[in-house]
Amino acid sequence: MGRRYFGTDGIRGTVGDTPITPDFVLRLGYAAGKVLAGAADGATGARPTVLIGKDTRVSGYMLEAALEAGFSAAGVDVMLAGPMPTPGVAYLTRALRLSAGVVISASHNPYQDNGIKFFSADGNKLPDETEAEIEAWLDKPLECASSDRLGKARRLDDAAGRYIEFCKSTFPAAYDLRGLKLVIDCAHGAAYQIAPHVFHELGADVIPIGVAPNGFNINDGVGATAPDALVRAVRANHADLGIALDGDADRLQVVDSSGRLFNGDELLYVLVKDRIATAGKVEGAVGTLMTNLAVEVALQREGVEFVRAAVGDRYVLEQLRERGWQLGAEGSGHILSLDRHSTGDGIVSALLVLAALKRSGRTLAQMLDGVTLFPQKLINVRMKPGADWKGSASIRAAIDAAESALAGHGRVLIRASGTEPVLRVMVEAQQAADATRHAEAIADAVREATS
Protein backbone atom coordinates (compact mmCIF):
# COMPACT_ATOMS: atom_id res chain seq x y z
CA MET A 1 0.00 0.00 0.00
CA GLY A 2 1.49 3.33 -1.05
CA ARG A 3 1.78 6.46 1.08
CA ARG A 4 0.38 9.84 0.01
CA TYR A 5 1.46 12.06 2.90
CA PHE A 6 4.26 10.38 4.82
CA GLY A 7 7.76 11.07 3.55
CA THR A 8 11.14 9.90 4.81
CA ASP A 9 10.65 11.76 8.09
CA GLY A 10 6.94 11.89 8.76
CA ILE A 11 4.61 14.47 7.23
CA ARG A 12 6.04 17.90 6.51
CA GLY A 13 5.12 21.05 4.62
CA THR A 14 4.33 24.74 4.74
CA VAL A 15 1.92 25.75 7.47
CA GLY A 16 -1.49 26.56 6.01
CA ASP A 17 -0.98 24.36 2.96
CA THR A 18 -2.27 20.78 2.94
CA PRO A 19 -1.33 18.67 4.80
CA ILE A 20 -0.08 21.10 7.48
CA THR A 21 -3.48 22.58 8.25
CA PRO A 22 -5.47 22.33 11.49
CA ASP A 23 -8.30 20.36 9.90
CA PHE A 24 -5.97 17.81 8.31
CA VAL A 25 -3.90 17.43 11.47
CA LEU A 26 -7.06 16.87 13.53
CA ARG A 27 -8.03 14.08 11.13
CA LEU A 28 -4.46 12.75 11.29
CA GLY A 29 -4.68 12.55 15.08
CA TYR A 30 -8.01 10.75 14.77
CA ALA A 31 -6.65 8.32 12.15
CA ALA A 32 -3.52 7.56 14.18
CA GLY A 33 -5.67 7.18 17.27
CA LYS A 34 -7.93 4.63 15.59
CA VAL A 35 -4.91 2.60 14.49
CA LEU A 36 -3.48 2.71 18.02
CA ALA A 37 -6.84 1.92 19.59
CA GLY A 38 -7.22 -1.06 17.31
CA ALA A 39 -3.82 -2.37 18.34
CA ALA A 40 -4.64 -1.84 22.02
CA ASP A 41 -7.99 -3.60 21.74
CA GLY A 42 -6.25 -6.54 20.16
CA ALA A 43 -3.66 -6.70 22.92
CA THR A 44 -4.68 -5.75 26.48
CA GLY A 45 -7.84 -3.78 25.79
CA ALA A 46 -6.39 -0.86 27.78
CA ARG A 47 -6.98 2.69 26.61
CA PRO A 48 -3.90 3.82 24.60
CA THR A 49 -1.93 6.90 25.62
CA VAL A 50 0.29 9.00 23.35
CA LEU A 51 2.90 11.64 24.17
CA ILE A 52 3.01 14.83 22.11
CA GLY A 53 6.13 17.00 22.03
CA LYS A 54 6.98 19.94 19.80
CA ASP A 55 9.68 22.41 18.89
CA THR A 56 9.36 26.18 19.26
CA ARG A 57 7.55 27.20 16.05
CA VAL A 58 4.56 29.46 16.59
CA SER A 59 2.42 27.02 14.61
CA GLY A 60 3.15 24.29 17.14
CA TYR A 61 0.40 25.53 19.45
CA MET A 62 -2.23 25.26 16.73
CA LEU A 63 -1.11 21.84 15.52
CA GLU A 64 -0.77 20.51 19.07
CA ALA A 65 -4.38 21.46 19.80
CA ALA A 66 -5.56 19.84 16.56
CA LEU A 67 -3.70 16.61 17.25
CA GLU A 68 -5.00 16.53 20.81
CA ALA A 69 -8.58 16.93 19.58
CA GLY A 70 -8.16 14.17 17.01
CA PHE A 71 -6.72 11.70 19.48
CA SER A 72 -9.42 12.52 22.03
CA ALA A 73 -12.15 11.94 19.44
CA ALA A 74 -10.63 8.52 18.75
CA GLY A 75 -10.70 7.64 22.46
CA VAL A 76 -6.95 8.01 23.03
CA ASP A 77 -5.44 9.74 26.07
CA VAL A 78 -2.79 12.40 25.50
CA MET A 79 0.22 13.54 27.52
CA LEU A 80 1.70 16.92 26.54
CA ALA A 81 5.44 17.41 26.94
CA GLY A 82 5.67 20.94 25.54
CA PRO A 83 8.96 21.89 23.84
CA MET A 84 10.95 18.67 23.69
CA PRO A 85 13.71 17.36 21.37
CA THR A 86 12.59 14.64 18.98
CA PRO A 87 14.84 12.04 20.66
CA GLY A 88 13.41 13.11 24.02
CA VAL A 89 9.93 12.15 22.85
CA ALA A 90 11.28 8.81 21.62
CA TYR A 91 12.93 8.15 25.00
CA LEU A 92 9.93 9.20 27.11
CA THR A 93 7.53 7.15 24.99
CA ARG A 94 9.59 4.06 25.69
CA ALA A 95 10.35 4.87 29.34
CA LEU A 96 6.73 5.61 30.24
CA ARG A 97 5.43 2.53 28.39
CA LEU A 98 3.16 4.64 26.20
CA SER A 99 1.43 3.52 23.01
CA ALA A 100 3.15 6.06 20.76
CA GLY A 101 4.97 9.37 20.64
CA VAL A 102 4.29 12.28 18.30
CA VAL A 103 6.62 15.16 17.47
CA ILE A 104 5.44 18.43 15.94
CA SER A 105 8.52 19.75 14.17
CA ALA A 106 10.05 20.46 10.78
CA SER A 107 13.54 19.83 12.17
CA HIS A 108 16.06 22.11 10.40
CA ASN A 109 13.49 23.88 8.19
CA PRO A 110 12.47 27.55 8.73
CA TYR A 111 9.56 28.51 10.98
CA GLN A 112 7.09 28.72 8.09
CA ASP A 113 7.24 24.92 7.81
CA ASN A 114 6.12 22.30 10.27
CA GLY A 115 5.58 18.58 10.38
CA ILE A 116 4.31 15.58 12.29
CA LYS A 117 6.29 12.41 12.96
CA PHE A 118 5.42 9.39 15.03
CA PHE A 119 7.32 6.97 17.24
CA SER A 120 6.17 3.49 18.15
CA ALA A 121 5.96 2.23 21.74
CA ASP A 122 9.59 1.10 21.63
CA GLY A 123 10.86 4.54 20.60
CA ASN A 124 11.39 3.74 16.93
CA LYS A 125 9.93 5.46 13.89
CA LEU A 126 6.78 3.81 12.60
CA PRO A 127 7.18 1.15 9.91
CA ASP A 128 5.90 1.99 6.44
CA GLU A 129 2.99 -0.41 6.87
CA THR A 130 1.67 1.43 9.94
CA GLU A 131 1.98 4.80 8.21
CA ALA A 132 -0.01 3.40 5.28
CA GLU A 133 -2.66 2.13 7.70
CA ILE A 134 -2.97 5.61 9.23
CA GLU A 135 -3.37 7.11 5.76
CA ALA A 136 -6.14 4.62 4.99
CA TRP A 137 -8.07 5.88 8.04
CA LEU A 138 -7.84 9.45 6.72
CA ASP A 139 -10.39 8.52 4.06
CA LYS A 140 -12.93 7.22 6.56
CA PRO A 141 -15.61 9.32 8.27
CA LEU A 142 -14.60 10.86 11.58
CA GLU A 143 -16.92 9.27 14.12
CA CYS A 144 -16.33 10.81 17.53
CA ALA A 145 -16.18 8.44 20.47
CA SER A 146 -19.04 8.61 22.95
CA SER A 147 -18.64 11.05 25.83
CA ASP A 148 -17.65 8.33 28.27
CA ARG A 149 -14.94 7.08 25.85
CA LEU A 150 -13.31 10.40 24.89
CA GLY A 151 -9.58 10.64 25.48
CA LYS A 152 -8.26 12.85 28.28
CA ALA A 153 -5.24 15.16 28.16
CA ARG A 154 -2.72 16.24 30.78
CA ARG A 155 0.68 17.89 31.00
CA LEU A 156 3.79 15.83 31.72
CA ASP A 157 5.34 18.36 34.09
CA ASP A 158 8.67 16.59 34.64
CA ALA A 159 9.33 15.72 30.98
CA ALA A 160 12.45 17.91 30.68
CA GLY A 161 13.96 16.63 33.93
CA ARG A 162 13.43 13.00 32.97
CA TYR A 163 15.11 13.51 29.61
CA ILE A 164 18.02 15.48 31.10
CA GLU A 165 18.75 12.60 33.46
CA PHE A 166 18.59 10.11 30.61
CA CYS A 167 21.11 12.11 28.57
CA LYS A 168 23.49 12.34 31.53
CA SER A 169 23.21 8.58 32.09
CA THR A 170 24.80 7.93 28.68
CA PHE A 171 28.04 9.66 29.76
CA PRO A 172 30.57 7.41 31.55
CA ALA A 173 30.37 7.73 35.33
CA ALA A 174 34.17 7.75 35.53
CA TYR A 175 34.38 11.09 33.73
CA ASP A 176 32.99 14.60 34.02
CA LEU A 177 33.27 17.79 31.99
CA ARG A 178 34.99 19.97 34.59
CA GLY A 179 37.54 22.30 33.08
CA LEU A 180 35.87 22.37 29.67
CA LYS A 181 34.37 25.54 28.26
CA LEU A 182 31.61 24.62 25.80
CA VAL A 183 29.46 26.77 23.54
CA ILE A 184 26.06 25.10 23.08
CA ASP A 185 23.94 26.37 20.17
CA CYS A 186 20.32 25.26 20.51
CA ALA A 187 19.06 26.87 17.27
CA HIS A 188 16.27 28.65 19.21
CA GLY A 189 14.70 25.21 19.07
CA ALA A 190 13.36 22.36 21.15
CA ALA A 191 16.51 21.85 23.25
CA TYR A 192 16.84 25.45 24.43
CA GLN A 193 15.83 24.61 28.02
CA ILE A 194 17.46 21.19 28.10
CA ALA A 195 20.86 20.98 26.39
CA PRO A 196 22.62 23.69 28.46
CA HIS A 197 21.52 21.94 31.68
CA VAL A 198 22.86 18.56 30.54
CA PHE A 199 26.38 19.83 29.92
CA HIS A 200 26.37 22.17 32.93
CA GLU A 201 25.27 19.40 35.31
CA LEU A 202 28.16 17.26 34.04
CA GLY A 203 30.57 20.02 35.07
CA ALA A 204 31.18 22.07 31.93
CA ASP A 205 31.38 25.85 31.79
CA VAL A 206 28.49 26.39 29.35
CA ILE A 207 28.01 29.37 27.08
CA PRO A 208 24.53 28.97 25.54
CA ILE A 209 23.49 30.61 22.28
CA GLY A 210 20.32 30.15 20.25
CA VAL A 211 18.27 29.90 23.45
CA ALA A 212 15.78 32.74 22.96
CA PRO A 213 12.97 31.31 20.81
CA ASN A 214 10.15 33.64 19.84
CA GLY A 215 8.20 31.32 17.56
CA PHE A 216 9.74 32.75 14.39
CA ASN A 217 13.53 32.43 14.77
CA ILE A 218 14.10 28.67 14.91
CA ASN A 219 17.17 27.75 12.80
CA ASP A 220 17.49 31.39 11.72
CA GLY A 221 21.23 31.98 11.42
CA VAL A 222 21.97 29.56 14.25
CA GLY A 223 22.10 25.82 14.86
CA ALA A 224 23.57 22.84 13.06
CA THR A 225 22.55 24.09 9.62
CA ALA A 226 24.13 27.53 10.18
CA PRO A 227 27.34 26.74 12.09
CA ASP A 228 29.04 30.09 11.40
CA ALA A 229 27.38 31.48 14.54
CA LEU A 230 28.92 28.67 16.57
CA VAL A 231 32.35 29.20 15.04
CA ARG A 232 32.23 32.91 15.94
CA ALA A 233 31.08 32.19 19.50
CA VAL A 234 33.78 29.57 20.08
CA ARG A 235 36.49 31.95 18.95
CA ALA A 236 35.07 34.96 20.79
CA ASN A 237 34.81 33.04 24.08
CA HIS A 238 38.05 31.06 23.66
CA ALA A 239 36.01 27.89 24.19
CA ASP A 240 37.38 24.37 23.99
CA LEU A 241 34.54 23.09 21.82
CA GLY A 242 31.26 24.18 20.33
CA ILE A 243 28.21 21.99 19.79
CA ALA A 244 25.38 23.02 17.47
CA LEU A 245 22.01 21.27 17.47
CA ASP A 246 19.22 21.74 14.96
CA GLY A 247 15.64 22.77 15.67
CA ASP A 248 14.53 19.42 17.05
CA ALA A 249 17.98 18.42 18.39
CA ASP A 250 18.34 15.13 16.56
CA ARG A 251 21.50 16.21 14.74
CA LEU A 252 24.67 18.10 15.61
CA GLN A 253 27.82 19.74 14.32
CA VAL A 254 30.97 20.20 16.40
CA VAL A 255 33.57 22.99 16.26
CA ASP A 256 36.98 22.83 17.94
CA SER A 257 38.89 25.68 19.58
CA SER A 258 40.48 26.70 16.27
CA GLY A 259 37.08 27.08 14.60
CA ARG A 260 37.35 23.89 12.56
CA LEU A 261 33.97 22.30 11.83
CA PHE A 262 33.49 18.54 12.11
CA ASN A 263 30.54 16.93 10.36
CA GLY A 264 28.72 13.66 10.94
CA ASP A 265 31.05 11.66 8.70
CA GLU A 266 34.09 12.68 10.73
CA LEU A 267 32.33 12.18 14.05
CA LEU A 268 31.33 8.66 12.99
CA TYR A 269 34.98 7.84 12.38
CA VAL A 270 35.92 9.24 15.81
CA LEU A 271 33.25 7.16 17.54
CA VAL A 272 34.28 3.99 15.71
CA LYS A 273 37.92 4.57 16.67
CA ASP A 274 36.87 5.07 20.29
CA ARG A 275 34.80 1.90 20.23
CA ILE A 276 37.74 -0.06 18.81
CA ALA A 277 39.94 1.28 21.62
CA THR A 278 37.45 0.26 24.30
CA ALA A 279 35.91 -2.92 22.85
CA GLY A 280 38.77 -4.16 20.69
CA LYS A 281 36.74 -4.53 17.52
CA VAL A 282 33.91 -2.97 15.54
CA GLU A 283 32.44 -5.24 12.89
CA GLY A 284 30.87 -2.53 10.81
CA ALA A 285 29.37 0.93 10.53
CA VAL A 286 26.68 2.43 8.33
CA GLY A 287 26.76 5.69 6.43
CA THR A 288 24.75 6.91 3.47
CA LEU A 289 25.20 7.49 -0.23
CA MET A 290 26.43 10.97 0.76
CA THR A 291 29.14 9.81 3.18
CA ASN A 292 32.56 11.10 2.20
CA LEU A 293 34.67 8.53 0.39
CA ALA A 294 37.68 9.32 2.59
CA VAL A 295 35.81 8.09 5.69
CA GLU A 296 34.88 4.83 3.99
CA VAL A 297 38.51 4.24 3.05
CA ALA A 298 39.72 5.12 6.56
CA LEU A 299 37.24 2.76 8.23
CA GLN A 300 38.16 -0.08 5.91
CA ARG A 301 41.80 0.56 6.81
CA GLU A 302 40.80 -0.07 10.44
CA GLY A 303 39.21 -3.39 9.46
CA VAL A 304 35.67 -2.02 9.78
CA GLU A 305 33.15 -2.97 7.12
CA PHE A 306 31.29 0.05 5.77
CA VAL A 307 27.81 -0.04 4.26
CA ARG A 308 26.02 2.82 2.51
CA ALA A 309 22.30 3.20 3.14
CA ALA A 310 19.87 5.44 1.30
CA VAL A 311 19.88 9.02 2.57
CA GLY A 312 17.78 9.41 5.70
CA ASP A 313 18.42 8.32 9.27
CA ARG A 314 15.58 5.77 9.12
CA TYR A 315 17.47 3.91 6.38
CA VAL A 316 20.72 4.01 8.35
CA LEU A 317 18.78 2.56 11.27
CA GLU A 318 17.33 -0.21 9.09
CA GLN A 319 20.81 -1.26 7.95
CA LEU A 320 22.17 -1.23 11.50
CA ARG A 321 19.36 -3.44 12.75
CA GLU A 322 19.64 -5.81 9.82
CA ARG A 323 23.33 -6.35 10.56
CA GLY A 324 23.27 -6.13 14.34
CA TRP A 325 25.70 -3.20 14.35
CA GLN A 326 25.73 -0.18 16.68
CA LEU A 327 27.14 2.88 14.93
CA GLY A 328 25.90 4.83 11.93
CA ALA A 329 25.68 8.42 10.79
CA GLU A 330 24.83 10.95 8.12
CA GLY A 331 27.15 13.79 7.20
CA SER A 332 24.38 16.20 8.20
CA GLY A 333 24.96 15.20 11.82
CA HIS A 334 22.41 12.47 12.48
CA ILE A 335 24.40 9.95 14.54
CA LEU A 336 23.04 6.62 15.72
CA SER A 337 24.50 4.62 18.59
CA LEU A 338 21.96 1.89 19.22
CA ASP A 339 23.48 0.81 22.52
CA ARG A 340 22.64 4.30 23.82
CA HIS A 341 19.35 5.27 22.15
CA SER A 342 16.83 3.97 19.64
CA THR A 343 17.10 7.06 17.44
CA GLY A 344 19.51 9.84 16.52
CA ASP A 345 20.10 12.21 19.43
CA GLY A 346 22.21 15.35 19.11
CA ILE A 347 22.85 15.75 22.84
CA VAL A 348 23.71 12.08 23.43
CA SER A 349 25.93 12.05 20.34
CA ALA A 350 27.81 15.09 21.63
CA LEU A 351 28.35 13.31 24.95
CA LEU A 352 29.70 10.25 23.11
CA VAL A 353 32.19 12.46 21.28
CA LEU A 354 33.23 14.17 24.52
CA ALA A 355 33.68 10.77 26.20
CA ALA A 356 35.88 9.64 23.31
CA LEU A 357 38.07 12.72 23.72
CA LYS A 358 38.28 12.17 27.49
CA ARG A 359 39.30 8.53 27.07
CA SER A 360 41.89 9.20 24.40
CA GLY A 361 43.34 12.40 25.81
CA ARG A 362 43.43 13.67 22.22
CA THR A 363 41.70 16.41 20.27
CA LEU A 364 39.25 15.80 17.46
CA ALA A 365 41.85 16.87 14.92
CA GLN A 366 44.35 14.42 16.38
CA MET A 367 41.83 11.56 16.31
CA LEU A 368 41.23 12.33 12.63
CA ASP A 369 44.91 12.52 11.76
CA GLY A 370 45.42 10.96 8.34
CA VAL A 371 41.77 11.30 7.33
CA THR A 372 41.42 14.10 4.79
CA LEU A 373 37.92 14.49 3.43
CA PHE A 374 37.46 14.66 -0.32
CA PRO A 375 36.00 18.05 -1.27
CA GLN A 376 32.25 17.82 -1.85
CA LYS A 377 30.01 20.34 -3.53
CA LEU A 378 26.32 20.08 -2.68
CA ILE A 379 23.79 22.23 -4.52
CA ASN A 380 20.10 22.14 -3.66
CA VAL A 381 18.06 22.97 -6.76
CA ARG A 382 14.42 23.86 -6.13
CA MET A 383 12.04 22.38 -8.70
CA LYS A 384 8.36 22.51 -9.47
CA PRO A 385 6.59 19.75 -7.51
CA GLY A 386 6.37 16.63 -9.67
CA ALA A 387 8.99 17.76 -12.20
CA ASP A 388 10.29 14.81 -14.28
CA TRP A 389 14.01 15.32 -13.83
CA LYS A 390 14.79 11.63 -14.36
CA GLY A 391 13.45 11.73 -17.91
CA SER A 392 15.54 14.73 -18.99
CA ALA A 393 18.18 13.96 -21.62
CA SER A 394 20.09 17.18 -20.85
CA ILE A 395 20.35 16.33 -17.14
CA ARG A 396 21.47 12.80 -18.00
CA ALA A 397 24.13 14.19 -20.36
CA ALA A 398 25.50 16.53 -17.67
CA ILE A 399 25.68 13.66 -15.16
CA ASP A 400 27.39 11.36 -17.67
CA ALA A 401 29.96 14.04 -18.49
CA ALA A 402 30.82 14.52 -14.82
CA GLU A 403 31.05 10.79 -14.10
CA SER A 404 33.31 10.27 -17.09
CA ALA A 405 35.64 13.08 -16.02
CA LEU A 406 35.79 11.86 -12.40
CA ALA A 407 36.05 8.13 -13.09
CA GLY A 408 38.14 6.50 -10.37
CA HIS A 409 38.68 9.64 -8.28
CA GLY A 410 35.28 11.05 -7.50
CA ARG A 411 31.52 10.47 -7.29
CA VAL A 412 28.31 12.03 -8.54
CA LEU A 413 25.10 11.63 -6.56
CA ILE A 414 21.73 13.05 -7.57
CA ARG A 415 18.68 12.54 -5.37
CA ALA A 416 15.34 14.14 -4.70
CA SER A 417 14.62 15.36 -1.18
CA GLY A 418 12.06 13.31 0.68
CA THR A 419 10.63 16.35 2.47
CA GLU A 420 10.58 19.23 -0.05
CA PRO A 421 10.59 19.81 -3.87
CA VAL A 422 14.35 19.98 -4.09
CA LEU A 423 16.89 18.00 -6.12
CA ARG A 424 20.19 17.55 -4.30
CA VAL A 425 23.23 17.55 -6.57
CA MET A 426 26.41 16.29 -4.89
CA VAL A 427 29.78 15.92 -6.55
CA GLU A 428 32.85 14.60 -4.75
CA ALA A 429 36.35 14.95 -6.19
CA GLN A 430 39.96 15.05 -5.12
CA GLN A 431 40.12 18.72 -6.10
CA ALA A 432 37.55 21.22 -4.85
CA ALA A 433 37.51 23.09 -8.16
CA ASP A 434 36.54 19.93 -10.03
CA ALA A 435 33.72 19.17 -7.59
CA THR A 436 32.34 22.71 -7.88
CA ARG A 437 32.60 22.86 -11.66
CA HIS A 438 30.78 19.59 -12.28
CA ALA A 439 28.13 20.23 -9.60
CA GLU A 440 27.31 23.64 -11.06
CA ALA A 441 27.08 22.21 -14.58
CA ILE A 442 24.59 19.58 -13.44
CA ALA A 443 22.63 22.10 -11.35
CA ASP A 444 22.36 24.44 -14.36
CA ALA A 445 21.03 21.56 -16.46
CA VAL A 446 18.45 20.77 -13.77
CA ARG A 447 17.28 24.39 -13.57
CA GLU A 448 16.88 24.62 -17.35
CA ALA A 449 15.03 21.31 -17.60
CA THR A 450 12.66 21.79 -14.65
CA SER A 451 11.91 25.52 -14.69
UniProtKB/Swiss-Prot annotation:
<dbReference type="InterPro" id="IPR005841">
    <property type="entry name" value="Alpha-D-phosphohexomutase_SF"/>
</dbReference>
<dbReference type="InterPro" id="IPR005846">
    <property type="entry name" value="A-D-PHexomutase_a/b/a-III"/>
</dbReference>
<keyword id="KW-0413">Isomerase</keyword>
<dbReference type="InterPro" id="IPR016066">
    <property type="entry name" value="A-D-PHexomutase_CS"/>
</dbReference>
<dbReference type="InterPro" id="IPR036900">
    <property type="entry name" value="A-D-PHexomutase_C_sf"/>
</dbReference>
<dbReference type="InterPro" id="IPR005845">
    <property type="entry name" value="A-D-PHexomutase_a/b/a-II"/>
</dbReference>
<dbReference type="InterPro" id="IPR005844">
    <property type="entry name" value="A-D-PHexomutase_a/b/a-I"/>
</dbReference>
<keyword id="KW-0597">Phosphoprotein</keyword>
<feature type="binding site" description="via phosphate group">
    <location>
        <position position="107"/>
    </location>
    <ligand>
        <name>Mg(2+)</name>
    </ligand>
</feature>
<feature type="binding site">
    <location>
        <position position="246"/>
    </location>
    <ligand>
        <name>Mg(2+)</name>
    </ligand>
</feature>
<dbReference type="InterPro" id="IPR006352">
    <property type="entry name" value="GlmM_bact"/>
</dbReference>
<protein>
    <recommendedName>
        <fullName>Phosphoglucosamine mutase</fullName>
        <ecNumber>5.4.2.10</ecNumber>
    </recommendedName>
</protein>
<feature type="binding site">
    <location>
        <position position="250"/>
    </location>
    <ligand>
        <name>Mg(2+)</name>
    </ligand>
</feature>
<dbReference type="Pfam" id="PF02878">
    <property type="entry name" value="PGM_PMM_I"/>
</dbReference>
<dbReference type="InterPro" id="IPR016055">
    <property type="entry name" value="A-D-PHexomutase_a/b/a-I/II/III"/>
</dbReference>
<dbReference type="InterPro" id="IPR005843">
    <property type="entry name" value="A-D-PHexomutase_C"/>
</dbReference>
<dbReference type="Pfam" id="PF02879">
    <property type="entry name" value="PGM_PMM_II"/>
</dbReference>
<dbReference type="GO" id="GO:0005829">
    <property type="term" value="C:cytosol"/>
</dbReference>
<dbReference type="GO" id="GO:0005975">
    <property type="term" value="P:carbohydrate metabolic process"/>
</dbReference>
<feature type="modified residue" description="Phosphoserine">
    <location>
        <position position="107"/>
    </location>
</feature>
<feature type="active site" description="Phosphoserine intermediate">
    <location>
        <position position="107"/>
    </location>
</feature>
<keyword id="KW-0479">Metal-binding</keyword>
<dbReference type="GO" id="GO:0006048">
    <property type="term" value="P:UDP-N-acetylglucosamine biosynthetic process"/>
</dbReference>
<dbReference type="GO" id="GO:0004615">
    <property type="term" value="F:phosphomannomutase activity"/>
</dbReference>
<dbReference type="Pfam" id="PF00408">
    <property type="entry name" value="PGM_PMM_IV"/>
</dbReference>
<dbReference type="GO" id="GO:0009252">
    <property type="term" value="P:peptidoglycan biosynthetic process"/>
</dbReference>
<dbReference type="InterPro" id="IPR050060">
    <property type="entry name" value="Phosphoglucosamine_mutase"/>
</dbReference>
<comment type="similarity">
    <text>Belongs to the phosphohexose mutase family.</text>
</comment>
<comment type="function">
    <text>Catalyzes the conversion of glucosamine-6-phosphate to glucosamine-1-phosphate.</text>
</comment>
<dbReference type="Pfam" id="PF02880">
    <property type="entry name" value="PGM_PMM_III"/>
</dbReference>
<dbReference type="GO" id="GO:0000287">
    <property type="term" value="F:magnesium ion binding"/>
</dbReference>
<feature type="binding site">
    <location>
        <position position="248"/>
    </location>
    <ligand>
        <name>Mg(2+)</name>
    </ligand>
</feature>
<dbReference type="GO" id="GO:0008966">
    <property type="term" value="F:phosphoglucosamine mutase activity"/>
</dbReference>
<keyword id="KW-0460">Magnesium</keyword>
